[in-house]
Amino acid sequence: GIWDTIKSMGKVFAGKILQNL
């Protein structure tokens, strides 16, 4: 569903932020 897509994008986004720390 739409929420699964949003959650997946959130995980990817969070991963990118952590890599930039």
Swiss-Prot record:
Cellular component terms per the entry's GO annotation: extracellular region
Tree of life domain: Eukaryota
Record's keyword annotation contains NAD: no
Localization of this protein: Secreted
An individual GO BP term: defense response to fungus
Disulfide links within the chain: none
Keywords: Amidation, Amphibian defense peptide, Antibiotic, Antimicrobial, Antiviral protein, Cytolysis, Fungicide, Hemolysis, Secreted
Chief location: secreted
Tissue: Expressed by the skin glands.
Signal peptide (from-to): none
PTM annotation (Leucine amide): residues: L21
Family: Belongs to the frog skin active peptide (FSAP) family. Brevinin subfamily.
Job of this protein: Antimicrobial peptide with activity against Gram-negative and Gram-positive bacteria (MIC=13 uM against E.coli, MIC=25 uM against S.aureus) and fungi (MIC=25 uM against C.albicans). Also shows hemolytic activity (HC(50)=50 uM). In vitro, shows moderate inhibitory activity against HIV.
Protein name: Brevinin-2-related peptide
Organism: Lithobates septentrionalis (Mink frog)
